Amino acid sequence: MSSDGYPAPIFRGRRRGVLLALSSPSGAGKTTLSKRLLSQNPDVVLSVSATTRKPRPGEVDGQDYHFISVDEFKKKIEDDEFFEWAEVFGRYYGTPKTPVMEAVEDGRDVVFDIDWQGAQALAAAAPDDAVRVFILPPSLALLEDRLRKRGQDTTEIIKDRMARAKDEISHWHEYDYVIVNDDFARALEKLNEILHAERLKRLRHPWLEEFVDAIMEQ
């Protein structure tokens, strides 16, 4: 009993984390949105993918990507160590399972910056934990303009990215939520609202079953 005569509060356990998969065509803003989301939420971490591509200037192994060889990557595929993996522009990318599930079980939310195929694979592997959000650009013309202004790709690569953008966008209806990124602040606000709502879902709180049982026994 507590000092005021009421039963002592029942311990409320840690919630289960959310696997938040963000997808969009290249240049639609999902990377910037995910970084800002992380900066505003201390319990949110970014899933660090493994890749066979070479590090770009300023990238840190284990922070931006796990940079591994093709042989190492293929061995991990054989050992079923990835939630999902894909070959993009001749390079392999994959999402390691172990660190992700450790974070989720510890009550942290994990953000994934992945394509539609990766989002599908993640949802199939962890249907109760995964939440898929698609980020749409206001228009394809604006998307192409953003890619050109970045100055990172050749004209040929931009052309290929635009073709891939249409394919990516065609899968928008497979997602749980869709955000049109025509205003960054509003798009970020919507993303935070989605995360906060998903955190409240019953399945994220496994402690509730024991909590309710205890109430019923009073």
UniProtKB/Swiss-Prot annotation:
Question: What S-S linkages are listed for this chain?
Answer: none
Q: Which residues bind ATP?
A: 24-31
Query: Where the protein is mainly located, per its record?
Result: cytoplasm
Domain Guanylate kinase-like: start-end pairs: 17-196
Q: Which InterPro entries match?
A: GK/Ca_channel_bsu (IPR008145), Guanylate_kin-like_dom (IPR008144), Guanylate_kinase (IPR017665), Guanylate_kinase_CS (IPR020590), P-loop_NTPase (IPR027417)
List the CDD domains. Answer: GMPK
Cellular component terms, GO, for this chain's entry?
cytosol
Where is it located? Cytoplasm
Q: Which Pfam families has this protein been placed in?
A: Guanylate_kin
Provide this UniProt record's keywords sorted from A to Z.
ATP-binding, Cytoplasm, Kinase, Nucleotide-binding, Transferase
Do the record's keywords include Disulfide bond? no
Q: Which SUPFAM superfamilies match?
A: P-loop containing nucleoside triphosphate hydrolases
**Annotated NCBIfam families:** guanyl_kin (TIGR03263)
Q: Which family does it belong to?
A: Belongs to the guanylate kinase family.
What is the official name of this protein in its record?
Guanylate kinase
Q: What is the lineage of its organism?
A: Bacteria, Pseudomonadati, Pseudomonadota, Alphaproteobacteria, Maricaulales
